[in-house]
Amino acid sequence: MNYLVMISFALLLMTGVESVRDAYIAKPHNCVYECARNEYCNDLCTKNGAKSGYCQWVGKYGNGCWCIELPDNVPIRVPGKCHR
């Protein structure tokens, strides 16, 4: 029984688990993509693997692109300064 659990766990680790999150997509140096139109953000987000995106008006970081179900390998805005 223990072998079955260990083999199942090993298979899970080998296949990898792709997770997603909702967040502001980030430029290099932890800056958000500024926006005025939802279409711009939706295109940007979907090109980076998200389900969709929209322009978050007057949000925490100003007018920035918010992505829905963005893959983990795409950088997101994290707390701290934007270093332009």
Swiss-Prot record:
Q: Where's it mainly located?
A: secreted
Outcome of mutating D72A, per the record? 0.6-fold decrease in toxicity to mice, and 0.2-fold decrease in the binding affinity for insect sodium channels
Q: Is Cell cycle among the key words of this record?
A: no
Q: In which tissues is it expressed?
A: Expressed by the venom gland.
Q: What is the effect of changing G62A?
A: >47-fold decrease in toxicity to mice, loss of activity on Nav1.5/SCN5A, and 56.7-fold decrease in activity on insect sodium channels
Q: What is the effect of changing Y61G?
A: More than 50-fold decrease in toxicity to mice
Q: Which residues form the signal peptide?
A: 1-19
Reported effect, H83A: 3.8-fold decrease in toxicity to mice, and 180-fold decrease in the binding affinity for insect sodium channels
Changing L70G: what effect? >47-fold decrease in toxicity to mice, loss of activity on Nav1.5/SCN5A, and 233.3-fold decrease in activity on insect sodium channels
Pfam families attached to this UniProt entry: Toxin_3
Would I find Cell division among this entry's keywords? no
Propeptide segments, given as residue ranges: 84
For this UniProt entry, the molecular function terms from Gene Ontology, in alphabetical order, are: sodium channel inhibitor activity; toxin activity
CDD domains in the record: neurotoxins_LC_scorpion (cd23106)
Q: Could you say what the effect of mutating P28S is?
A: 1.8-fold decrease in toxicity to mice, and 1.3-fold decrease in the binding affinity for insect sodium channels
Where in the cell does this protein reside? Secreted
Upon changing I76G, the result is: 1.1-fold decrease in toxicity to mice, loss of activity on Nav1.5/SCN5A, and 2.5-fold decrease in activity on insect sodium channels
According to its UniProt record, which protein family does this protein belong to? Belongs to the long (4 C-C) scorpion toxin superfamily. Sodium channel inhibitor family. Alpha subfamily.
What function does the entry list? Answer: Alpha toxins bind voltage-independently at site-3 of sodium channels (Nav) and inhibit the inactivation of the activated channels thereby blocking neuronal transmission. This toxin is active against both mammals and insects, and is classified as an alpha-like toxin. It is active on Nav1.2/SCN2A (EC(50)=139-252 nM), Nav1.3/SCN3A (EC(50)=565 nM), Nav1.4/SCN4A and Nav1.5/SCN5A (EC(50)=195-500 nM), Nav1.6/SCN8A (EC(50)=214 nM), and drosophila DmNav1 (EC(50)=30 nM).
Record-given protein name: Alpha-like toxin BmK M1
Q: Which organism was this protein described from?
A: Olivierus martensii
